[in-house]
Amino acid sequence: MKINQPAVAGTLESGDVMIRIAPLDTQDIDLQINSSVEKQFGDAIRTTILDVLARYNVRGVQLNVDDKGTLDCILRARLEALLARASGIPTLPWEDCQ
């Protein structure tokens, strides 16, 4: 999936996450995580994000994640909504990502 434009998903409310994405000129993934629970769950947050990006074959992006103690399922949902917005695809290719 190609990321064509910057996008934002989520809020800064307690129990939620705000994720910002922007395309890069390289194929790197620049991941910046700011979390109130990073010491306890930082590795799990990073693993979840990289798993979703790999599932949709996303490369060449900068991600800024402001986590306020969100659950894993919400993190995945916010990230999938973000990818749809940033790629310009109205619906994600669910069949290809199972």
Curated annotation (Swiss-Prot):
Cellular component aspect of the GO annotation: cytoplasm
Name of encoding gene: citD
Originating organism: Shigella boydii serotype 4 (strain Sb227)
Protein family (similarity comment): Belongs to the CitD family.
Location, primary (coarse class): cytoplasm
Entry-linked NCBIfam families: citD (TIGR01608), PRK13253.1 (NF009726)
Protein name: Citrate lyase acyl carrier protein
Keywords: Cytoplasm, Phosphoprotein
Modified residues (O-(phosphoribosyl dephospho-coenzyme A)serine): 14
Subunit relationships: Oligomer with a subunit composition of (alpha,beta,gamma)6.
Compartment(s) of residence: Cytoplasm
Free-text function comment from the UniProt entry: Covalent carrier of the coenzyme of citrate lyase.
InterPro entries in the cross-refs: CitD, Mal_deCO2ase/Cit_lyase_ACP
